[in-house]
């Protein structure tokens, strides 16, 4: 069975690698071996294992001397350890005795400390009893001598002691409380009497007694009530004085001063009595006083505003303005109604009243916000009291009248400026432009000063309507006049008066576009400062965008008027351009040299432009004159391009075209502040093509080889221009790959 023997040999080989010599398992394994080869291998492994053991034994034996020496040292150390142990036991005994002694001492100390604490408490109680007795005697003595301040201090000190030692001196407490009640009665009686007599020093004396007596809240209420009475009395006197002046029919009734005095009294009452109010109830006392005095402001302030509205008959005036068909903001002529100068006076008065109310409200709200230790719910409550009560509603009524009056004032003055429009010496515009935008600027500034977003939006709407209707119509009027072009060149010569009228009308449009954008920018900046809320800014931005659209509308109107003017001038230039069609560009060297001396057409064209257009320069704004001149240049360039595309050129003719184009660019560049080179780009590129030596040279300038030059001619136009050269063959041009 060879296969079985091989398997046994393999198993023995595998098992021999895991034998651990010196163990019973190894001995059993050796006895089980049957293969000589396995036995031989195991024998060699056993011999190797024996050699490793011999080596380990030699190593251990080499350390014997060192180990013996260490063992001797350990034996000596054992003797020392016995001595150390004895010393340690002795020290442990000492520590234990010391610990026991410390425990005994600390216990005695704790007992002494407890006894001392009890003695101190007892002494404190004795001192308290003595001091309570002193307080009782002090109160009685102070009351007898009417030294109420000292009596209040004694009461306060007694109450503090009584709060600390609640279980002692009930008899003393009864005596003190009797004296306290007596002092409270005296303080209240004296305070009420002083309030009735408005004896301020006495009021201050007795209201200060309420805090040490623990009656802070009652004292605060009485003192703030006194302040309200004083303010009410002064406010009533001011109001009655105003009513008396009204009944006497006197025109100068100072409502602004009356309201100012009311606000001043309230603010001074808060500021000057801050210490008293804080002494009674801290910052809560200040907040309480502000809210209480605001009630007086609501009462007196709303009465003043209502009386002002009655005095100026604002309701009737507003009704007349709203109901009159001549006073609405639609295109129209002169209106009949209130005198705008009186209305402006009313507007200024209303603005003063509104500004006073806003300043007062902002001050008082900021005063409340500065109080850090008050109830967090007090701030929104107080703010609501300022924003939603009767005075605030009266301000809203006045604001509505302001918007109506401001709108009327704006409409009347803008229409008046349009009606009395006249030429201003040494000015390029008529009086209407500056006058109208001054009125709009003034009215919008006033509206912003109200800090009322609705007022600003309404006045902005008025301004936009006026500019889009009345003012727009006034700007168009001159341009729409019939036969304006015919009158511009009567007898073949530019008529200065007509030119001035046309130029001024166009200048009005140009300057108006600029003024609208300036006004828009100014209003936007001011509103950004006054109205920080994002929602308010969005509303204003929406209204201002309409002003921007009006500027674009005026710009379109200006362009239309400018085109009409150019259409009047260009027929006088066209004859010179028509002569260019008769001039040959198939030049010989002699003809080219002759043209250099005697220009065939460029100078005549420039002279025609100077004669028919340049005389308008001093009459126009620089922007308008540049636009006017550029429109003429556009006309000239387009006509020249058409003419040149119909000609035939020699190479010298191409040079002549380049020279002519350069002369035009140079001259026109001196006439205008804007660049004109781009307008002649196509002609310049035509001249470049016509100057080439051969057709293929165009590839040096085309496509990737064009460099910084941008081609204005299409590939088809380039082929057409190449075809204008008499020397170039059509088949060469057709072969070009552009």
Curated annotation (Swiss-Prot):
One term under GO cellular component: Golgi membrane
Transmembrane segments: none
Keywords recorded for this protein, A-Z: Golgi apparatus, Membrane, Protein transport, Transport
Membrane topology: Peripheral membrane protein
Subcellular location: Golgi apparatus membrane
Keyword check for Membrane: yes
SMART domains: Cog4 (SM00762)
Any one of the GO BP annotations: protein transport
Family matches, as InterPro entries: COG4, COG4_C, COG4_M, COG4_N
Family: Belongs to the COG4 family.
Function: Required for normal Golgi function.
Assembly description: Component of the conserved oligomeric Golgi complex which is composed of eight different subunits and is required for normal Golgi morphology and localization. Interacts with COG2 and COG3.
Protein name according to UniProt: Conserved oligomeric Golgi complex subunit 4
Lineage: Eukaryota, Viridiplantae, Streptophyta, Embryophyta, Tracheophyta
